[in-house]
Amino acid sequence: MSRTLIKDALAAPAPADAILLQGWVRTRRDAKTFSFLELNDGSSLKGIQVIADSSLPNYATEIARAHTGASIEVRGKLVASQGQGQKWEVVAAEFKILGEADATYPLQKKGHTLEFLREIAHLRPRSNLFGAVFRVRSRLAFAVHQFVQNKSFLYVHTPIITASDAEGAGDMFRVTTLDLAHPPMTPEGEVDSAKDFFGKKTFLTVSGQLEAEIFATALSNVYTFGPTFRAENSNTSRHAAEFWMIEPEIAFCDLDGDMALAEEFVKYLIRDAKEHCAADLEFFSKFVDKELMARLDFVLEKPFVRCSYTEAIEILEKSGKAWEHPVSWGSNLQAEHERFLTEEQ
C-alpha cells in the first residue's frame, strides 16, 4: 500500500477501508480503552486524528510510547469523524513507531516564541509557524515560474560566484581560496588575487541582471530567480544578507509594459497563495498579522498608482515635511521619500 499524505486524506471525497499514513505525533490524550493522537506530516497545517484502541496487540508495548514528537506509521480505516471541527479520522488497525521521542521533546501544543524556536533550529520546521511559512514559500516559488513561463519567458541560470557587480546593488561578499593568514603578496605589498582560484577577485552575486540583459538581447523575454547576497551590515526588516530575487528582462518593452507586468505578477501571486494556501494564510492572520488578509485584498482590488518622477518630486516638495535628505528635481529618492509616497498619500 502506498502512503497517503495527510492533506489528501483530509480532502478525501469518501471513506476508505485501507489507508497508510506516516508522520509525527503532535498531541495525544488517553481515555480508558483507547488513545487519540493528532498526526501531522507537514503536508498541511491541520493534522488528522488517529484512534488507537487498547485491543491492538502492541498497545501497551508500543502505542503507549508514542509521545509527542514520535515518528509513527499507521494503517487503518478512514472514517467520518464523530468530533467537531474535522471531517475524517483514522481508526488504526496497525501501529508502528518509526522513531521515538521522550518527555524532553521541546515542541509542545502551546505557542512558542521565535527566540525559543531559534534555540531548537533542528526542530523548528515542525512548528506551525515554520511549516506554514515554507509551504507558502514553496507555493509562491512555483507560482513565480508558472506566471512567467505562461508568458513565454525563458528561465536562465546566472552565476552565483562572479567577478561582476551591478549598479547600486550594495557591497559584495568576497569569495577566495587564499590562505588568509598568509596570503600571497604582490611586489607592491597588496594581496595577489592572480594566485586565487579564478585568477582574479570574485564575489557572491548581488544580481543576475547583467547576464539576464545579455540573454534578453538574444532570447527576448528571460528571467532569473535565485539566491542573491548583499554585504550590507544594516540590521533592519528591509535588509537581508541573503535572499531570493526575481529579475525579468524584456526585449522590445517600454516602461508602461514593464509596470503592467509587475502589477499583474504581484496580483497573480496573491491570488495563487489565497487559493492554494488558505489555511496557512489564515494562521498568519490569526497569530502573526491580523491585518494580513485585508492588506492582500486591498492590493488585489486596487489598481497600482502610476506616478512620474517629476510628479513625485512635486508631491514631496509640497508636503511641508522636513526631510533628512533634501528634495529637489534631479536628486535620488530615499527610503523616507518612498515611504511617504506609498504610505501617506
Regions of interest found by a model, annotated:
Residues 2-251:
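Class II aminoacyl-tRNA synthetase-like tRNA-binding/catalytic domains
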Residues 217-219, 254-275:
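His/Asp/Glu-rich mid-to-C-terminal helical/loop segments that flank catalytic regions of hydrolases
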Residues 32-33, 212, 256-257, 320-322:
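Short amphipathic alpha-helical segments with coiled-coil-like heptad repeat character
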Residues 132-136, 254-261, 304:
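Catalytic cores of large soluble enzymes that bind and process phosphate-bearing ligands
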Residues 234-235, 253, 300-303:
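Alpha-helix capping and helix-loop boundary segments enriched in small/acidic/polar residues
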Residues 165-192, 264-345:
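Metal-assisted phosphate- and nucleotidyl-transfer catalytic regions
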